[in-house]
UniProtKB/Swiss-Prot annotation:
One Gene Ontology cellular component: extracellular space
Glycan attachment points: N218
Protein name per the record: Opiorphin prepropeptide
Species the sequence originates in: Homo sapiens
Entry's localization field: Secreted
Pfam families according to UniProt: PROL5-SMR
GO biological processes: regulation of sensory perception of pain
Pyrrolidone carboxylic acid PTM positions: Q22
Coiled-coil zones: none
């Protein structure tokens, strides 16, 4: 298998590679390099002598050689068998005539026998089937009588009463304040104060005391971290004012 593959591959490569004569042109030989080709002369070949013994055991004596002479064959037990039919001429095989007038016939013969035409009978009666397919059956179309009558259309506009109720709710705001007890150790406490700006001022933000611990937000609610709890509300301010007024 491998040898066949390699031989086929070499044959395929040799088809696409140029031969030695196609690679480069050979230079002409000089006159003294090669001898001239010999002239053609017919040679006389002496006839070979006959074999000393033939394939037969009792071979006849060899006759003097004469060109074109074939020695006669002798019958022996080892010679080729003789067919008796070849000794007598063969006679032509006689064939009986078909009928009188052969080969000039009054009518030509057909190449094959054509029997009578057989008509297959259908399994059902052919008349209704033929009528159902080939004869058109008329289907009467139904007649439609259209009658028109006077019609009156009255339209009343609908009247609906809808009751509208409006409810108004006022927003209520609840403020819850818680007090953080102050312990002996200072702990950070948070206080949430809600302040409403006055009507005369335009700035809505309010900064509480203790600026280093103040966280400023954009909203009005601010978260402050300090050691002491300070609740800035109107109720506590009025309480301290009353206390200072009493003990002042």
């Amino acid at each position: 298998m491998k040898l066949t593959f390699f031989l086929g591959l070499l044959a395929l490569i040799s088809c696409f590679t140029p031969s030695e004569s196609q690679r480069f042109s050979r230079r002409p030989y000089l006159p003294g390099q090669l001898p001239p080709p010999p002239l053609y002369r017919p040679r006389w070949v002496p006839p070979s002598p006959p074999p000393p013994y033939d394939s037969r055991l009792n071979s006849p004596l060899s006759l003097p050689f004469v060109p074109g002479r074939v020695p006669p064959s002798s019958f022996s037990r080892f010679s080729q068998a003789v067919i008796l039919s070849q000794l007598f001429p063969l006679e032509s095989i006689r064939q009986p005539r078909l009928f009188p007038g052969y080969p000039n016939l009054h009518f030509p013969l057909r190449p094959y026998y054509v029997g009578p035409i057989r008509i297959l009978k259908p399994p059902f009666p052919p008349i209704p089937f033929f009528l159902a397919i080939y004869l058109p059956i008329s289907n009467p179309e139904p007649q439609i009588n259209i009658t028109t009558a006077d019609t009156t259309i009255t339209t009343n506009p609908p009247t609906t009463a809808t009751a509208t109720t409006s409810t108004s709710t006022k927003p209520t705001m609840t403020i819850s304040s818680s007090t953080v007890p102050i312990s002996s150790t200072p702990e950070p406490a948070t206080s949430i104060s809600a302040a409403t700006p006055a009507a005369s001022t335009e700035n809505t933000t309010q900064i509480l005391a203790n600026r280093p611990h103040t966280v400023l937000l954009n909203a009005t609610v601010q978260v402050t971290t300090s050691n002491q709890t300070i609740l800035s509300s109107p109720a506590f301010k009025s309480f301290w004012q009353k206390l200072f007024a009493i003990f002042g």
